[in-house]
Amino acid sequence: MELKGKVINFLGDSITEGMGTTACEKIYHQIIKEKYDMEHAYNYGISGTRIARQIIPTKDFTKHDLTFELRADIMDKNADAVVVFGGTNDYGHGDVPFGEIDSEDVYTFCGAVNSLIKKLKKDFPNKKIIFMTPLHRLNEEEPSEPDSKTLKDYAAVIVEICKKHNVGVIDLFKINPLDPNDKELVPDGLHPSDKGHRVMAEVIAEKLLEI
């Protein structure tokens, strides 16, 4: 897709919000905006949020329960595209089952992805909808959710569900642009640094141009 002059909504969690960066303009989507002369790159990232609903509400961190689908209503409806970047918090601290690939039960991860895609297609008809799979992270093979799925399982099912719905995917998990053990790029093993966001931006922009 052409990026120049475009408006893109970026819906995500702490990485999209910019945790780990030193300034807003250092976030991957703002880097892309400036480099490719986009009109707007709207930041709809909220730290700690998940794609799926939570069975037991999160104490003290209630904003974590503002799922992607709940927040989709506030996004700019005139955008040319929506980029969804999530799943790592569903893996990291979600309490719902992984679910079945054809489910629309938002109290499962698979169901919530299906439901989110359905909503985005309704709200943004004839617009580009693109999902990005989670980046590699430390403890990605130490699941806490009830079905003991690894982060690799989450990434794989996002790809599979998106293919089913004919939705674009940037498979960052497969591309693996950032080593979570590299302290310069990912200091805490999860949130990229300014330099990490620059690396991400290059990869994401290249893939967006191909979609």
Describe these PLM feature segments.
Residues E2-N9, I15-Y107, G111:
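Conserved SGNH/GDSL esterase-like catalytic core that processes O-acyl groups on lipids
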Residues F10, E17, F173-P177:
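Short alpha-helical interface patches
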Residues G12-D13, S193:
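Conserved G/P- and acidic residue-centered "switch" motifs that form tight phosphate/ATP-binding loops
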Residues H64-I211:
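Alpha-helical cap/lid subdomain in secreted, periplasmic
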